[in-house]
């Protein structure tokens, strides 16, 4: 028997420790989160994507009584990115994404300077659901270094990569497809 293991790296940061580009994504995700429509789960989520050339696109979750018709915030942002990037003749390759989620109607105060965070476990940080991690993976052009930022409900920012958040993905490469070539 052989054992294969992997370490998952997540950094907990104050807003001031982020780059200006990361700060913009986190602020955008937090702002658009307040537009969510979540009458059933009462959990509002906002997402912001930065594509390869620096454009930022956002989205929020919109629920319907038929759960399969619900649009996740990450999907909404990506749909906007695809539409706008395709107008320019480009594919929407995700460079970084920020996600902010929390109870309906509550604003999350962004911690801008040093503050002691609560003791947390790694599985308490939900960067995205499995469905959205798959969407992010495929639209990162299978680049494991795409940055994911999570505005926690206590105001700190957690930073990881899609490779760490989704360590065993199934994607185009498993089917022998070079996603960059097939989208030209």
Predicted regions and their residues:
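Short solvent-exposed loop/turn micro-motifs enriched in small/polar/acidic residues
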Residues: 40-42
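Helix-adjacent hinge/juxtasegments
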Residues: 55-101
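Short, electropositive, low-hydrophobicity segments enriched in small/polar residues
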Residues: 50, 63, 134
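Short beta-strand scaffold segments in enzyme catalytic cores
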Residues: 44-51
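Short acidic-glycine loop/turn motifs at beta-strand connectors
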Residues: 51-55, 152-154
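Short glycine/serine/threonine-biased micro-segments
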Residues: 44, 57, 128
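C-terminal binding/interaction regions
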Residues: 1-38, 85-184
């Amino acid at each position: 028997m052989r054992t294969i293991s992997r370490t998952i790296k997540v950094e907990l940061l104050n807003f001031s420790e982020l780059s200006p580009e990361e700060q913009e994504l986190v602020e955008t995700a937090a702002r658009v989160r307040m537009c969510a429509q979540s009458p059933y789960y009462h959990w509002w989520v906002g997402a912001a994507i930065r594509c390869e050339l620096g454009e930022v696109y956002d989205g929020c979750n919109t629920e319907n009584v038929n759960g399969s018709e619900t649009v996740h915030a990450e999907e909404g942002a990506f749909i906007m990115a695809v539409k706008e990037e395709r107008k320019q003749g480009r594919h929407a390759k995700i460079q970084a994404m920020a996600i902010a989620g929390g109870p309906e109607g509550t604003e999350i105060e962004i911690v801008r300077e040093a503050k002691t965070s609560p003791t947390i476990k790694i599985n308490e940080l939900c960067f995205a659901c499995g469905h959205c991690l798959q969407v992010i993976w495929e639209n990162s052009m299978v680049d494991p270094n795409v940055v994911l930022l999570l505005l926690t409900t206590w105001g700190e920012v957690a930073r990881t990569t899609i490779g760490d958040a989704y360590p065993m993905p199934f994607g185009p490469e498993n089917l022998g497809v070079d996603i960059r070539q097939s989208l030209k």
